[in-house]
């Protein structure tokens, strides 16, 4: 058994076991940790297949952002998971049926999957010999699709700014300090001498 085959079986077994533990874990924090291990194992499989860019995306996006967000949400929110677990019994038959349908679809797809011999020659941009996957993808994005790539970045930037503007609300019922008005006020008018008579208020 070569090192490649051993690493493949190791990552595959760890990914399957960790995925099962995500579903079977009673503690939600443990489930998120098992989910992180599943993503890391899947990233290892992508590296073995030569898709190191996809592996880096999987680690940065899913492990570094989504899974950590899940972990913080689970740890910070006071959720009664015991009550939620009791309600899952009602939806178990429907969930099992959906799982069987999805499993049948995956099995059908694997049985009829067939790759043509001329598929590699029909690629839009085949990778040159001796060039890594990440380098080839970078050359395509920043050479052939440079303007489209920059346009996609601008669309994401506009979407981010729009989300900030939608959530930014200026409340009028809160007293705020107007620093600009204070800086431009006349010092002679800032103080006012008031002669208060005994027994009277302002």
Swiss-Prot record:
Cellular component aspect of the GO annotation: plasma membrane-derived chromatophore membrane
EC main group: translocase
Protein name: NADH-quinone oxidoreductase subunit J
MF term (GO), any: quinone binding
Transmembrane segments annotated in the record for this chain: 3-23, 31-51, 53-73, 93-113, 146-166
Superkingdom in the source lineage: Bacteria
Reactions it catalyzes: a quinone + NADH + 5 H(+)(in) = a quinol + NAD(+) + 4 H(+)(out)
Subunit record text: NDH-1 is composed of 14 different subunits. Subunits NuoA, H, J, K, L, M, N constitute the membrane sector of the complex.
Recorded phenotype for the gene knockout or disruption: No functional NADH-quinone oxidoreductase complex. Cells lacking this gene have a nearly normal respiratory growth phenotype on lactate, however they are unable to perform anaerobic photosynthesis. It is suggested that in R.capsulatus this complex may function in reverse flow under physiological conditions.
Known role: NDH-1 shuttles electrons from NADH, via FMN and iron-sulfur (Fe-S) centers, to quinones in the respiratory chain. The immediate electron acceptor for the enzyme in this species is believed to be ubiquinone. Couples the redox reaction to proton translocation (for every two electrons transferred, four hydrogen ions are translocated across the cytoplasmic membrane), and thus conserves the redox energy in a proton gradient.
Localization annotation: Cellular chromatophore membrane
Keywords: Membrane, NAD, Quinone, Translocase, Transmembrane, Transmembrane helix, Ubiquinone
Membrane topology: Multi-pass membrane protein
Family: Belongs to the complex I subunit 6 family.
UniProt EC number: 7.1.1.-
